[in-house]
Amino acid sequence: MVKGKKPYIDRKKAVTFHLVHRSQHDPLVTDENAPQRVLLEAAARQQKPKDPEPPTDPAQRQEELKKFGIHFDDDYDYMQHLKKRENDVVWEFMENPNQARKQKVQDSEKPGPAPKLMLPSSVFASEFEESEGMLNKAAPQTLRLDWDPDVVAALDSDCENEELEDDFVIQAMAEGDSDDEEWDDEDGEEQSDMDFDSDDLNEDENEDELMDRLAPLMRERRFDDEEVKSRFTEYSMSSSVIRRNEQLSLLDDRFEKFYATYDDPELGDLALEDIEGNWHQKHPVVMQCFQEFKKKDKGIEYNKEWDRERIEKYRNVVEGEEDPTEELVEYEVDDPKQKKWDCESILSTYSNIYNHPKVIDEPRRSRRSSASTNPAPIQIDPKTGLPTNVLRGGVDGQLTAKALANLADESPAATGPKSLCAKSVLSTLSVLSIRPKDETHEEKKERKRLLKDYRNERRIEKKANTEAFKEEKKRQTHVKINQRTNQQGASIV
């Protein structure tokens, strides 16, 4: 930053805000026009509300504990484990240490006047908040066991929209008198001063009205002899408190039938005996199976003789030539032409009486016949790598200067510039590579051509020699292996 330039934001006078969700205690949380997120000052987030101090007087502390159902008479502070129902959430802002070093202010400096904010009130939270949040208000209440069962049954009944009679107050007072009746449970049987007779009941009253009238009398009734468990109640508190009216019973029956379809015997694959039906011969599935079977058994041929024999058998039975009650048994007849073996012959096939192990010897040949038919083999000298007895004029076929001179004399004369034919192979390459001083253009051209031809000839000769040596080496190796094998066999014998 250039020195002397005023910064866009003065960090000493700036106010930091955090964008947070609107509190559930805010009345505007359900307003669609109000924003769901508000600005919260960073300094305000660090302010944590202080919990009220517990009372120090023992008498006041015991009264406070009795409000929550704690009746212990010791000095332990049980109030430290209790929390408020509102469950206030406090945001604690942790400042970045790197930014804290940059924004350090000297202790001697005094804070300036509070900055003025020109922001609308809709971006901030409401000043007044409700004691209970919207989520706690909207949460459904569970079963209230402290309610009267008659009230629960009345709220759950399906006769809410029926018109009340004119004397409903008198009827209610008459039904209330039954609350003062006494019941004696000493012998396990319920007794009452009032006796009910089936003749006293009105025939026009239905079962629901009768149950409503008898509800106060059945308040303390035991349900030992009734089955209140189902697939979805599981002896719950609601099934024992709320009376099952006609609609709820119908709903329970439907659920029972629905759950019955998911029993263990109905799960998994269907049983094969339950599958019924038939397909005609031209059905696609039958034809597909036939085509697959036909592809697999292509080698099976149709035997007309076999079918003819079976038809003749059944025809004789139908025409009466054979007894139809007689059971036909098919069996295979051995071919008399087939060679039969006895036990001794079969065992002889597994024996080795005709097996005589022996080393096969090479047949001997006379020297005259071998010399006339087969020439002497070529032997390779291991020192020079050349065949022996091929250098004429040398002593014992060795490579000497005299033998090389004789070989050079016997070689045909070569044609070339300046008596090139009288030189050896090495001298020929040297002469063709060196350019003489008095060489003309034509001589140079001829020398280049000869050098090129010479190199091609040497390349072909070198390749031919390499192949010849490889073949000869293979042949010699094969001969040595055969000789070694024959020698070992001879030593064993």
Swiss-Prot record:
Phosphoserine modification, residue list: S345, S369, S370, S424, S427
Family assignment from sequence similarity: Belongs to the LTV1 family.
Quaternary structure, from the entry: Interacts with RpS3; the interaction is RNA-independent. Associates with free 40S ribosome subunits.
Ranges of biased composition (kind: Basic and acidic residues): 465-474
GO CC terms of this entry: cytosol; nucleus; preribosome, small subunit precursor
Coiled coil: 437-468
Protein name: Protein LTV1 homolog
Effect of loss of the gene: Lethal at the second larval stage because of defects in pre-rRNA processing. RNAi-mediated knockdown in fat body cells results in accumulation of RpS2 and the pre-40S ribosome in the nucleus and overall decreased cell and nucleus size. RNAi-mediated knockdown in wing imaginal disk results in caspase-dependent cell-death.
Subcellular location as annotated: Cytoplasm
Single annotated GO MF: ribosome binding
Chain segments carrying region Disordered: 42-63, 97-119, 170-207, 359-387, 465-493
Organism: Drosophila melanogaster (Fruit fly)
InterPro entries, A to Z: Ltv1
Function recorded in the entry: Necessary for the biogenesis of 40S ribosome subunits by regulating pre-rRNA processing. Non-ribosomal factor required for efficient nuclear export of the ribosomal 40S subunit. Necessary for endoreplication driven by Myc.
Keywords: Coiled coil, Cytoplasm, Phosphoprotein, Ribosome biogenesis
Acidic residues biased stretches: 176-207
Biased amino acid composition, Polar residues: 479-493
Pfam families linked: LTV
